Amino acid sequence: MGSEMCIRDRNILGYRPYADDVVDYFVQKSISNGIDIIRIFDCLNDLRNLQEAVNATNKFKAQEGRGEAQVALAYTLGDAYTLEYWTSMAKKIEEMGADSICIKDMAGLLVPYKAAELIKAMKEVTKLPIQLHTHYTSGVASMTYLKAVEAGVDVIDTAMSPFAMGTSQPATEVMVETFKGTPYDTGLDQNLLAEIADYFRPYRDECLANGLLNPKVMGVDIKTLLYQVPGGMLSNMVSQLKEQNAEDRYYDVLKEIPKVRKDLGEPPLVTPSSQIVGTQAVFNVLLGERYKMATKETKAVLRGEYGQTVKPMSQEVIDKVIPGEERITCRYADLLDNEMDKLEGEMKEWKQQDEDVLSYALFPQVATDFFKYRQAQQEKVDMTQADTKNGAYPV
């Protein structure tokens, strides 16, 4: 295994859909800067949104001999998400040219025996390596990994013990010890792993002390299994209700979430669909009328800008929220013009290296502030104080 990064389909690391030429350039520069595996997922599991990143990875691999495209399927529950659905997706991923598959269980919903069933079924239809990524939020992740490994999964994602468990992954050391002396023995040295854990433990303590790491995310939250809601989505929902002095409506919102999810075509609850569904559920409850106010993201989902959902969206909600609007049935990126030349022109005064344009594309305000800071450090001139129009600088 080499270094790996995760990108969100055509949104890459940002918050809007980017044209294909931006996706292509980002993948190229990621691999040339040392990333070996590009893990690509889509919040709707719409494979059309992933094809360009897979193509870009394969193109660079053909040229340079490096880079692996791993397509991640967002795991979720619902009557549409059958074994046949998952095996069909696995076959399509192999056909689209991916090098491996990741089952991305962001909410910790995949329980042990279902994991074994899923892995066995997918292994029967694809020769691609399968990697499993889950979270300990619901408390079953280690057992899920055990059954998945026994069923033939190729790779499991873990975290070093100081930052494991809770909303993170099972501890690396625990899984290494679990498989020691079995056909699945990793061969990893526990003494060396202990040194790594000792290195990171003070950072964990520092994060706890300064509030960067909330103790609440370090335990088990069984509500994840009951409501099928990822831990991060619950935290975000609580914050929204607290801001509105409406924490007493918590369970009302929890009941509304599956209704909104159904209205929007039953998408997996993963970034950004989890935030879209959660925020809309809060609005529906607090305003006393469903879809009295719809967020711009909810409208975009209903228009089809995010892609195709596994089930049809509610026509009643479509008629109420975006009455008379034309809906998109093609891949949304097909409607976008290439952007690289435009982006290069907008930030040319700051460009010092090729990667700068990608920083600007993904995080324009943050990147611009950094470019100004970098120039100030290099030239000892604070551009926020300079009067560039009159060529003056305060002394």
Say what each PLM segment does.
Residues 1-7:
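Short, small-residue-biased leader/transition segments that mark boundaries at the very start
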